[in-house]
């Protein structure tokens, strides 16, 4: 009787250990489904990426590696530079200032509708979840209440976020 219960305990511990190892390490993943390469840093060493050149890959001929070009500045003519062929000068206008934009628009402030959509919360509270899955990073079916149909809310569920009926 004792040996049988001992074997049952050993099997239970092996199964639990396997589940924890899979959840913590994610040893194998299906090809093409969210696989990411992770750089491991060793104490005293930098990341390995980009140290060795691949054969046949070198700097482009005629390109200076020390100086980086700003794409905006590269398009603007110098103040003393003449206009190119086919370009007419406007009287009283400096050709250098003519190519600068009048007003710069902040891309974050240009999208207030999206910001309001994400922050929209529906009334009610999420149901309490008693049991959770063991996945380290479970997949989410929604990110905000706005993505859920009707009165449903985006809540933390059994395994990741999902649309649920509120309390």
UniProtKB/Swiss-Prot annotation:
Residues covered by region (2 X tandem repeats of SVP-1 like motif): 78-126
Residue numbers spanned by region 12 X 6 AA tandem repeats of [GSAL]-[QEK]-[DGLP]-[APSLQ]-[VGDFI]-[KR]: 44-115
Tissue: Trachea and large intestine.
Gene Ontology BP terms: antibacterial humoral response; innate immune response
Keywords: Disulfide bond, Protease inhibitor, Repeat, Serine protease inhibitor, Signal
Occurrences of domain WAP (ranges): 119-167
MF annotations from Gene Ontology: serine-type endopeptidase inhibitor activity
Signal peptide: 1-21
Location of the region described as Disordered in the Swiss-Prot/TrEMBL record: 46-104
SMART domains from the UniProt entry: WAP
Sequence repeat residues: 44-49, 50-55, 56-61, 62-67, 68-73, 74-79, 80-85, 86-91, 92-97, 98-103, 104-109, 110-115
Record field: compositional bias (Basic and acidic residues): 79-91
Keyword Repeat assigned: yes
UniProt repeat feature SVP-1 clotting, residue ranges: 80-101, 104-126
Propeptide: 22-70
Protein biosynthesis is among the record's keywords: no
GO cellular component: extracellular space
Disulfide bonds: 126-155, 133-159, 142-154, 148-163
PANTHER family: ELAFIN, WHEY ACDIC PROTEIN WAP
General function of this protein: Neutrophil and pancreatic elastase-specific inhibitor of skin. It may prevent elastase-mediated tissue proteolysis.
Protein name: Elafin
